[in-house]
């Protein structure tokens, strides 16, 4: 018999995380590596564990993640978004608490594009008076 599996996709900046929750003892695997090997900062690990703290399900699920694109912070927040969506699929009762904490909202902020005639998105070339 196939085991129960809950899936969620999270996005943040240019990162996309495909998350699978399997009932287990709380192991988190990101791209085939342990979470402590993949994310070097404790703050990022705490960040992606927030949905479990809010729903009080820490240690109930093993998390398998495939994430690509962006940097470490964007990836951690994409994983958090994916975990929240997967938890919602596991139990719709969590919607209220996750929504209040802002875990289900896709953060729309992206890098602003470089404009022609400027050095960056907003920085203009150095001005010379003479």
UniProtKB/Swiss-Prot annotation:
Residues 111-130 have a biased composition (Basic residues). GO terms for biological process: translation. Pfam families: Ribosomal_S9. Keywords: Ribonucleoprotein, Ribosomal protein. GO terms for molecular function: RNA binding; structural constituent of ribosome. GO terms for cellular component: cytosolic small ribosomal subunit. Residues 98-130 are annotated as: Disordered. InterPro entries: Ribosomal_Su5_D2-typ_SF, Ribosomal_uS9, Ribosomal_uS9_bac/plastid, Ribosomal_uS9_CS, Ribsml_uS5_D2-typ_fold_subgr. The keyword Ribosomal protein applies. Belongs to the universal ribosomal protein uS9 family. NCBIfam families: PRK00132.1. This is Small ribosomal subunit protein uS9. The lineage of its organism: Bacteria, Bacillati, Bacillota, Bacilli, Bacillales.
């Amino acid at each position: 018999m196939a085991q129960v599996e809950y899936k969620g996709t999270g996005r943040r900046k240019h990162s996309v995380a495909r998350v699978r929750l399997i009932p287990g003892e709380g192991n988190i695997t990101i791209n085939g590596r342990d979470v402590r090997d993949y994310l070097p900062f404790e703050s990022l690990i705490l960040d992606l564990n927030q949905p479990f703290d809010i729903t009080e399900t820490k240690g109930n699920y093993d998390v398998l993640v495939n994430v690509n694109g962006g940097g470490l912070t964007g990836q951690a927040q994409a994983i958090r978004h994916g975990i929240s969506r997967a938890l919602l699929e596991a139990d719709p009762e969590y919607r209220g608490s996750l929504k209040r904490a802002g875990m289900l909202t896709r953060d729309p902020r992206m890098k602003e594009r470089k404009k022609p005639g400027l050095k960056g998105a907003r920085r203009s070339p150095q001005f010379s008076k003479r």
